[in-house]
């Protein structure tokens, strides 16, 4: 299979990442980052998500337009655009507080029609659309970011739907990462990617297992590096590139992302409504509000 310029829809979460010690906000979020990086890597990318009509939402929309991403699937809803405030403790990034705002949405009929016309659709754990993944996979190749979730039940239910299943495995040694990738493959994923930060990555497919080291870089901020790696891998697979070439290009792209603040740039002065902010623990403990 070779698709020179694949069409990819990224569905789900977005956020403005607000750096407390810089008074700057950057557009981000797993699905939104994926759309931008896929577009940069030569795909035709569309982002389907939701923002509010506030400063953060307008900045997200403008940033996507500036990157050439199709925003016809970006909804504007009453409420607040999602944000996360990021601090710095002894050189380590710390997530201080956040608000999911209107960012968690369910797919509508028009979203599914658009997905059916695409080559692939990307989403992930942070988008909270697991109940709709079968609908996605029925219409296009599904790329799903499990992040750090590795429960048997989740892998067994989602991996069979996946063209590309991706995991963040910075805490895994090489053998554990390889075992996880093979478990996802055995559960039904066609391709499985494990990113391990500075320890490199492994891509397991129908006929090959390919490992690659991380590319050297001066790390400023790792936010968005995993999304970069996944997007470059998906684009490469759809183009029919060799796994080794895909991983080398993805590692180089992720290294570049680590060299600056924010997922893909576009800083603006922080302007958010913190009246509904919660701690990160509270965010994870509370069921998300899903907007129709």
Language-model segments: residues:
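Short, acidic/turn-prone active-site loops that include or flank metal/cofactor-
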Residues: 31-32, 99-101, 146-151, 169-173, ...
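Hydrophobic anchor at the start of a short beta-strand
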Residues: 8, 45, 71, 141-142, ...
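Conserved beta-alpha-beta core of the PfkB/ribokinase-like small-molecule kinase fold
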Residues: 119-183, 199-201
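Active-site metal-binding loops of divalent metal-dependent hydrolases
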Residues: 13-14, 170, 228
């Amino acid at each position: 299979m070779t698709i020179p310029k694949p069409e990819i829809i990224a569905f789900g979460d977005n956020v403005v990442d607000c750096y407390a010690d810089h008074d700057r906000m950057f557009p981000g979020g797993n699905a939104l980052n994926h759309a931008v990086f896929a577009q940069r890597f030569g795909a035709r990318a569309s982002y389907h998500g939701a923002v509010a009509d506030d400063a953060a939402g307008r900045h997200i929309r403008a940033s996507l337009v500036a990157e050439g991403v199709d925003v016809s699937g970006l909804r504007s809803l009453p409420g607040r655009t999602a944000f996360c405030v990021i601090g710095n403790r002894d050189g380590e990034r710390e997530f201080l507080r956040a608000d999911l705002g209107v960012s968690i949405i369910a797919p509508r009929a028009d979203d599914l029609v658009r997905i059916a016309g695409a080559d692939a659709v990307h989403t992930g754990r942070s988008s909270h659309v697991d109940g709709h993944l079968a609908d996605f996979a029925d219409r296009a190749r599904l790329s799903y970011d499990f992040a750090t979730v590795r429960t048997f039940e989740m892998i067994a239910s989602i991996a069979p739907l996946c063209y590309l299943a991706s995991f963040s495995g910075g805490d895994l040694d090489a053998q554990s990462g390889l075992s996880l990738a093979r478990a996802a493959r055995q559960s039904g994923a066609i391709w499985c990617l494990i990113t391990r930060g500075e320890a490199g990555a492994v891509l397991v497919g129908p006929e090959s297992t390919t490992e690659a080291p991380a590319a050297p870089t001066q790390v400023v901020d790792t936010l968005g590096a995993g999304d970069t790696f996944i997007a470059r891998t998906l684009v490469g697979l759809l183009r029919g590139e060799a796994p080794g070439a895909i991983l080398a290009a993805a590692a180089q792209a992720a290294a570049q992302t680590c060299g600056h603040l924010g997922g893909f740039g576009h800083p603006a002065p922080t302007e958010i409504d913190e009246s509904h902010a919660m701690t990160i623990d509270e965010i994870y403990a509370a069921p998300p509000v899903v907007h129709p």
